[in-house]
């Protein structure tokens, strides 16, 4: 009850602050609202009113308003702000169009200010976001995970329901109707962990568009950002992925077999990509390909000629609806290439993309590992053998303790890497450590969970066997989850 009252007070304080901001906005006058039209045809205004109304719309459309008894306050604020319009994005047949006007030059998020001390305590905003996402994962993802795993596909409305959380919007600059004013790598890691606690397979299609938004924000040109980023700040977020992995043994992301060659009109891409979540409904890909002997990233729309998508379910992550992306002489314009004009700089930017994705996969291992721990502790305390709980046996107790020890080590390494990346510091070492820990210890989390449940761990009546299969993917996965 105390925690609930605290949450209600926190939400009400935020609503009241929004009301004050709106009042100040009214005092200086508002711009004439833009007309609604097709995606990207109108300039995006950077006014506080628009940002506040987007937040209120998300809260009003969810259960939070009734749960925390703030609907009356929201209605009062909304009534005062009826002149603010909202733009609805297209459906699966969308055409990405460049927005006119707006800020000049590509928009980059600033690095976070370096604190004088190492603090693992989340900020108030991070805590609120994490709690909201964790609740979504528990109420929506966990119950749907079993059926999604059996069907090898995520629910059709999953991304739309997740869009209410604003997971993608927090990586889009304010200039494009987003909510970001600086890099939020740590926040993205916390969000990925919270979603994976519900189910890692279902977390992938939700996080994949956010990875594309990160790539566009970090390395996209002004034209690329104006064409694609506005779509990632709305309620109809396109299914999109950063695809790096290729279907071959001992895959090295820095030795790509997908090739890009120059053509009179731009580039032509050939190759095969794997680990593409929700591949059948994807609209946009950021494809890693080798250009002139060095890796680069290219924007490829799903409707491009020569793009073929095949289902490719695996042992784990079946709920993600994994597929393969076949690129057969796909022509893209020169403007489709992400990153700097200098090949060496572009290669380093690609390396950062790989490192960010490895931090993302480590975060998924953290969330799933925590799910294993939370599941086995009550089980070993309640399961009795020879007249006492099996947790009284040292072999069992030590195994549970080791999960917690290794999980905390993985979490520390991942958060340290995320913190350094957020501050614009080198994080190559930390990303490598997080990758190694996630690969080795993550798989051990799943294995120990199955062992602790005994025969039950091998059956689908318990989710631990699914988590074990999902965790085995950490060592071979690349891309997708850029934080």
Predicted regions and their residues:
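Glycine-rich phosphate/cofactor-binding loops in nucleotide/flavin-utilizing enzymes
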Residues: 24-108, 191, 211, 453-483
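Internal helix-loop-helix
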Residues: 102-106, 134, 164-236, 278-284, ...
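Short, contiguous pre-domain boundary segments
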Residues: 106-122
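Glycine-rich beta->alpha junctions and the first turn(s) of the following alpha-helix
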Residues: 122, 309-409, 474
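C-terminal helix-coil-helix/basic helical segment that borders enzyme active sites and/or dimer interfaces
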Residues: 142-150, 377, 381-388, 404-437, ...
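A short, Trp-centered hydrophobic/proline-enriched beta-strand micro-motif
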Residues: 235-245
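A short core secondary-structure module
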Residues: 270-310
